[in-house]
């Protein structure tokens, strides 16, 4: 029967579409990468989601985040993403969690509820904890490495974390995961050498923070503010969505 996912079903088949419909995916980090992960998955027929992020849409998100418009500035990212996903597929189930994932909040999540976990967060501590919790629960996880300070979207690769090269974040993650006995981890990374951002305090969030009132993570509290584009994190997010769809449909 013709439906909104018919074009996808022509490639994946009816059985795969049923698997996607019955799957629950947790996406941690609904930003430049995570937003496009959600977009790709909901348009592919995944039936249930948990969205995790405590941030609000900021004016500086408009250059790259699919949820960011002038009208959504100041709104919680998970709420905006949920509304968008339900407009695409009203039948999907989307739960939102307005929290910043850290070891202290890990107990709030039951990873055995998920069929797949997507790590699209920025901090190493959070990323490592996500990997440990997902693997402990036996749930597949894919982790995004650095997408900031990059200009060439064609340089993204899918690989095991221990086979990555050229990505500073991946290097830090390799060390941290090796210390904790993690043997493997599927990641999306770019082998492009990062571009050093221009030091211009007149356009720096560090000196002109315009985060929405009540935002928990101010730019002035961050060590570095990376440069970004519309066409790099979006590609990383869609590659991740493709990997999740492929793995779930073959499970």
Protein language model regions, located:
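N-terminal charged helix/coil linker that caps or initiates catalytic domains
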Residues: 1-26
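Glycine-rich phosphate/adenylate-binding loop
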Residues: 2, 109-116, 126, 136, ...
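Conserved N-terminal Rossmann-fold NAD(P)-binding element of oxidoreductases
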Residues: 27-29, 52
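Hydrophobic/small residue at the entry helix of a nucleotide-binding pocket
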Residues: 33-34
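Glycine-rich phosphate-binding loop and adjoining beta1-alpha1-beta2 segment
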Residues: 46, 51-89
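Conserved SAM/SAH-binding loop
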Residues: 98-106
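Short, well-ordered coil/turn residues at beta-beta hairpins
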Residues: 120-121, 144
């Amino acid at each position: 029967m013709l439906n909104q996912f018919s074009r996808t079903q022509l490639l994946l088949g009816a059985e795969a579409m049923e698997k996607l419909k019955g799957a629950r995916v947790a996406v941690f980090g609904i930003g430049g990468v995570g937003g496009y992960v959600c977009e790709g998955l909901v348009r592919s027929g995944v039936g249930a989601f948990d969205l995790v992020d405590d941030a609000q849409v900021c004016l500086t998100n408009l250059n790259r985040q699919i949820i960011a418009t002038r009208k959504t500035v100041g709104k919680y990212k998970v709420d905006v993403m949920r509304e968008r996903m339900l407009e695409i597929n009203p039948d999907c189930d989307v739960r939102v969690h307005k929290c910043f994932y850290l070891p202290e909040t890990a107990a709030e999540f039951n990873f055995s509820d998920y069929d797949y976990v997507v790590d699209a967060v920025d901090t190493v501590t959070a990323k490592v904890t996500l990997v440990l919790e997902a693997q402990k629960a036996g749930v597949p996880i894919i982790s995004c490495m650095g997408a900031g300070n990059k200009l060439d979207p064609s340089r993204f690769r899918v690989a095991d974390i221990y086979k990555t090269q050229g990505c500073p974040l991946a290097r830090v993650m390799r060390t941290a995961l090796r210390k904790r006995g993690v043997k493997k981890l599927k990641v999306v990374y770019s082998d492009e050498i990062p571009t050093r951002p221009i030091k211009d305090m007149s356009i720096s969030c560090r000196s002109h923070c315009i985060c929405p009132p009540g935002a928990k993570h101010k730019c002035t509290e961050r060590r570095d503010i990376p440069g970004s584009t519309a066409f790099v994190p979006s590609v990383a997010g869609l590659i991740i969505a493709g990997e999740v769809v492929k793995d779930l449909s073959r499970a």
